[in-house]
């Protein structure tokens, strides 16, 4: 009975979040298929992260696969449909700035949460352990080996690139200041 009640409250909370998102998140009316992608983003965000998110503060954008083309290569920039929630106001410390999901053929290909944070000291080894634990806790991958890691200039996330037991590559983003995983992305391994 207790498990049923917890599931019911979680489901009701998710529906409330979607309802708020429908009513207040975007000033422009989304198509039915775009709204479905936004609903998926909210569900996936709640599955992987517990950072507070007040949906009234965000607007939604949807970019369908193939809409954005790289001018140099004439190839699509994204592998799937990309959905983004963007905060409309100035964030405070540790508040979500943006949530981006990519869906490839209807399946979640990756999710990333950008959080406003102040610089702190960290150990790259401990952050790698956080990335591995995140993959395991969310049943994304049980066994991984580190390929490499990178900190992009002027960004607070370290990107760890892992090879899985199925020989796929997953990038995990760990915020150095929060010492928490803030995203993952399944990739062919060519880019970091």
Show which residues each predicted segment covers.
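Bacterial N-terminal signal peptides that target proteins for export
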Residues: 4-12
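Hydrophobic membrane-insertion alpha-helices, especially the h-region
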Residues: 17-18
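Post-signal peptide N-terminal segment of mature Sec-exported envelope proteins
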Residues: 33-52
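Sec/Tat-exported extracytoplasmic proteins
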Residues: 45, 49, 62, 135-139
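Exposed beta-strand-loop-beta-strand "reactive/processing" segments of non-cytosolic proteins
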Residues: 53-102, 146-177, 185-191
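Long, charged/polar, surface-exposed segments that mediate recognition or autoinhibition
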Residues: 96-150, 192
